[in-house]
Amino acid sequence: MVTYINHIDAIIKHADERCKEHGSRLTVKRKQVLTVLVMSNKALSAYELVDVYKQEFGHNMPAMSVYRILEFLENENLAHKLSLVNKYVACTHISYLHTRCIPQFLICRDCSKVEEINIKSTIISELNANINESGFKLLSRQLEIDCVCEACI
């Protein structure tokens, strides 16, 4: 358990350093919301975050505040919004730079578990070419794939 807590602390420390490098601040509440996302094994909606925040920290946080914090975390590449389920996950690459990675997500439709994976850029390029050939334009390179995880099969 101590190793797990140390791992989370290290992730939050990296996130704090990245924010400072960008001239922004990872405030206490932002750290707490990010911690909840990092600790969660599934994607969470803003309202689920409100509930978990109250359980973990004993304070109420309005949903609008959570949405503002989530927007900040997205802008800092510390969290991702999953449009397919309208929920959020912590970026799994917080501890290192991933400027060349395009986030791709496997989302379990039964338990909401999310796995962030890397897909070769050649596959994304080929997909984009196929989309263009079909007369469409790819608006987001982030893929969210509806799946069922091993535990739910």
Go through each PLM region and give its residues.
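Non-DNA-binding regulatory cores of transcription-related proteins
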Residues: N75-I153
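Short, Lys/Arg-enriched N-terminal segment that forms or immediately precedes the first helix
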Residues: D9-G23
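Basic amphipathic alpha-helical segments that dock to polyanions
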Residues: V66-E76
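Pre-recognition alpha-helix immediately N-terminal to the DNA-recognition helix
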Residues: K31-V36
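Short helix-coil-helix linker/hinge
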Residues: L26-K29
